[in-house]
Amino acid sequence: MDSGKEGEAPAATSSPESRRTRSNGKVKAFADAAPPSATVVSTKATPLPRGGWKKGVAILDFIIRLGAIGSALGAAAIMGNSEQILPFFTQFFQFHAQWDDFPMFQFFVFANGAAGGFLILSLPFSIVCIVRPYTVGPRLLLVILDILMMALVMAAASSAAAVVYLAHNGSQDANWIAICQQFTDFCQVTSEAVVASFVAAFLLICLIVVSSVALKRG
């Protein structure tokens, strides 16, 4: 019986070397294990998609463009229909006033008609700017042409306003008498046309400002 117990003792007892080997293996296993991935929390705000405000500006451009079309073509149509014939006349002279009797009014009709035609042709480019807010080429072209049309309409409205002023008030220094006391309807119609033309010029200025804002890099 003693010999059996002596034979089982070495199996139950582990040597210090084997314990060190097992402990070294555990340490190596922990060292070889991949460290847990650290969760990185970003404090940077997610950028919101830009371009929505540019699309809104393009829609505003389209609406203003429609108003400018109505004002320019309305001014040309009103001035083109300005005519008055007084009910009295002499044997050699008939009192008649018409828009084409004045070169400034002729230029007025041409300028406002040309501006209205340009604004109609510019509508497709304005729609392209709505569909593609970041496009630069059509918007830059519209800015350049809007500036030219604004200068043309402003010149026509200013020259016509000078004639209308003289028709209402005359000029004592130049011995020009006022004719609006006789041609009341003619002066009223031409005054309305000049006001409509100045409205068109103001809307063209608004278009230039809106297009410049749309071209700004956000």
From Swiss-Prot:
Subcellular location: Cell membrane
Gene Ontology biological process: cell wall modification; cell-cell junction assembly
The protein's assembly and partners: Homodimer and heterodimers.
Any matching Pfam family: CASP_dom
Membrane protein topology class: Multi-pass membrane protein
Region described as Disordered: 1-26
Cytoplasmic compartment residues: 1-58, 128-139, 214-218
Keyword Transmembrane helix carried by entry: yes
Listed name of the protein: Casparian strip membrane protein 5
InterPro entries to which the protein is assigned, alphabetical: CASP/CASPL (IPR006459), CASP_dom (IPR006702), CASPL (IPR044173)
Function as written in the Swiss-Prot or TrEMBL entry: Regulates membrane-cell wall junctions and localized cell wall deposition. Required for establishment of the Casparian strip membrane domain (CSD) and the subsequent formation of Casparian strips, a cell wall modification of the root endodermis that determines an apoplastic barrier between the intraorganismal apoplasm and the extraorganismal apoplasm and prevents lateral diffusion.
Superkingdom to which the source organism belongs: Eukaryota
GO cellular component: Casparian strip; plasma membrane
Sugar attachment sites: 169
Ranges in the topological domain labelled Extracellular: 80-106, 161-192
Chief location: membrane
Similarity annotation: Belongs to the Casparian strip membrane proteins (CASP) family.
Keywords from the UniProt entry: Cell membrane, Cell wall biogenesis/degradation, Glycoprotein, Membrane, Transmembrane, Transmembrane helix
Residues that span the membrane, as ranges: 59-79, 107-127, 140-160, 193-213
